[in-house]
């Protein structure tokens, strides 16, 4: 087996094998007719086998019908004698095919013809994005590192480079390995007219591989919104803004497949994701408030006044630049020297960087202000609810306690959680937090401290 064949991805090798198996040498119409099965009376048998023979060997139809792995549809990929607007097989195409098989071969059973089309398409699979990416030859000039600076004026630093490289690796991986784990959204943030949406559209290479039509994450037909697209833009983060909760957003981005039944099919099927998601926002505080971390969102600030060119100034040149950037990305992908995640150091930087893009956390601010003035060494959730959040006469609900716990554990530094309940004079036995460097207490441990709690000694523990 030669080196060119070995360099192909396994999926591409299998697709080529399927294509070669399906591509029987075309024969003349008379030769095909002579080889068709007949009935006892000498007529053409209306069988799937006969229909399949025609689709495989007819000089017009041989190699014409293929299954598009990206769109999950059947395509007609070569001229077959009538005008067509797109490659996807549609109802009008079927009428022409039925007419051709009836007039040329006497085959008239529509169901058997349709079954034969399904078989021949399945034996002749292709993936347009894989074919495109595999055809690229890199010229050796580095572009990923400078792309966002070139078109959008972003900082030309390691973070911007790693952010775009990670996104490109995710997109390539999803094309060659549908359903692979990739839950990252590259988010371009900056003023209107900077070219953010255009960047994602051109990044998709072909307009039909791009979509900005995703408005709701809980749409029952979300698979139809993703089907056939490679780069999905969430314009102004509308879909995440309309989400019911941060957990819904996390779940959607983490999903690796959709389970969906295409109309007129009998059974639902797993549809592994072949797309990645990019976000655009004019507003700075676009990130959803998530105290446990927004690691799925990678914001990059853009400054169009610093861009070397506007992306639409010369669209042909911009497309050529992006094509060579994909060629560079394919070199990285083929090398295998990449991960679909940030390094630990970059993750730490991202966590700090994201704070600039989150809405103000008013409750965390109130608790921090309270603790800055508080002179005691221990606090509990109930105390913070009543004293820091000003609910002196209310009892906290369970979700409010969980929210305070999350703030203390995720947003407040200098305090350490203790899991074993201790006695607070105002609030009873409670779990809570203690200062990491409390002042030395020289008093009797049974005496009330400045916090209003009594330290429980071993002798004071309840005997049950």
Question: Where are these predicted regions, by residue range?
Answer:
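N-terminal nucleic-acid engagement/recognition segments and initiation subdomains in replication
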Residues: 1-143, 158, 162, 394-395, ...
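A composition-driven signal for long, intrinsically disordered, charge-rich low-complexity tracts
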Residues: 3, 7, 15, 21, ...
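Residue-level preference for alpha-helix termini and adjacent loops
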Residues: 60, 66-69, 75-76, 81, ...
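Feature primarily recognizes SF3-like P-loop helicase cores of small DNA viruses
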Residues: 102-127, 181, 208-212, 218-253, ...
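P-loop NTPase catalytic core of nucleic-acid-dependent motor ATPases
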Residues: 117-227, 231
